[in-house]
Amino acid sequence: MTTWVIKIGTSLLRGNDKYTTFDVINDYCSYISKAQRNGDKIILVSSGAVGLGCHQMRFKTRPKEIISLQASAAIGQLHLMALYEKAMSSFGYKVAQILLTRSELGSRNSYNSASQTLKRLLEWDVIPIVNENDITSDEELKYGDNDTLSALVATAISADQLILLTDIDHLYSSDPKINSKAKPIKDINNSKELNNLELANEQTSWGTGGIKTKLTAAKIATESGIKVQLADGRDPKILGELLDGKKIGTVFHPNPNPIGNRKSWLAHAIKPVGEIHLDDGASEAIKNKGASLLLVGVKKVSGDFIANQPVKVINTEGEEFAKGICSMSSDAIKIGINSRSETTGSPLVIHRDVLVLTSE
């Protein structure tokens, strides 16, 4: 049995007079239902609510104002789920709607609740259809088309594989629309190759928008031991071939030493509310020895936060290299820094169990 998370991008759901959006969804669902019958478990992360809402409202162009996009999503989400429910019911399966936001997943309780709910639905042989809640969050509308969300969902349920279906057949060394010599990339074997690819593409238009968020999603998932495949989903039969085990598109191979669910949540789901700046000794102890952070190694603190909130950990070069849950408030740290000479011992600021490296 394989547990899959499948992300379908907005552009793939645009139908036409001869091949409607329902036809597209129905074809995808035929392959999903086949895999379910063979014992696999599948969660679908589907964009498309805004586009369907605009179609329902007969807009000639996509609105630019965020509130109009959110209102369009409110209309389109209902229609999107109706199409999935109609398609999957014809194959004998029930669907469930799950609307999430990045900020909700940044809460450990909400993250665990979402994880447990998704797993229970899979136990019931129900197909969860996940989308970002565009009404309360505008992150997908501005940036990600659900790429990051799909990776967070995959880590939350400890999926085996994440499939990112898009409108390109591979990742390329550069933008193939501009550079005729751009080479397709078939395998990303480790985090170093992925980091190098991210760095190289940051310097070009190829590294913005959709490609950038897909690389981020791949990084989140592979760090947690999840295999990622990016493939051209414009022909739904490609999904069937992927679910049958065929290698198509670009494969991001999983880290053989995954960081674990909790550390992945710390690294990627939480939104830090402050910064703690360290001296060289504390930075090296954390990076090379996996040490906890003590007050003696803290040079300064930025931001206002209470105890048990997430923070960035900054080295002497001003670079973030870790994140963690701080056991002290910002005020307590400032007082501690100013009175260090009067204390014996050094209070714990971040325990190693809730501290994760975010750069090598």
From Swiss-Prot:
Annotated source species: Prochlorococcus marinus (strain NATL2A)
Compartment(s) where it occurs, according to its Swiss-Prot or TrEMBL record: Cytoplasm
Residues annotated to bind substrate: S47, D134, N146
Function: Catalyzes the transfer of a phosphate group to glutamate to form L-glutamate 5-phosphate.
Domain of life: Bacteria
Pathway recorded for this protein: Amino-acid biosynthesis; L-proline biosynthesis; L-glutamate 5-semialdehyde from L-glutamate: step 1/2
GO biological process assignments: L-proline biosynthetic process
Pfam families (alphabetical): AA_kinase, PUA
Domain PUA stretches: 273-344
Entry EC no(s): 2.7.2.11
Protein's recorded name: Glutamate 5-kinase
Record gene name: proB
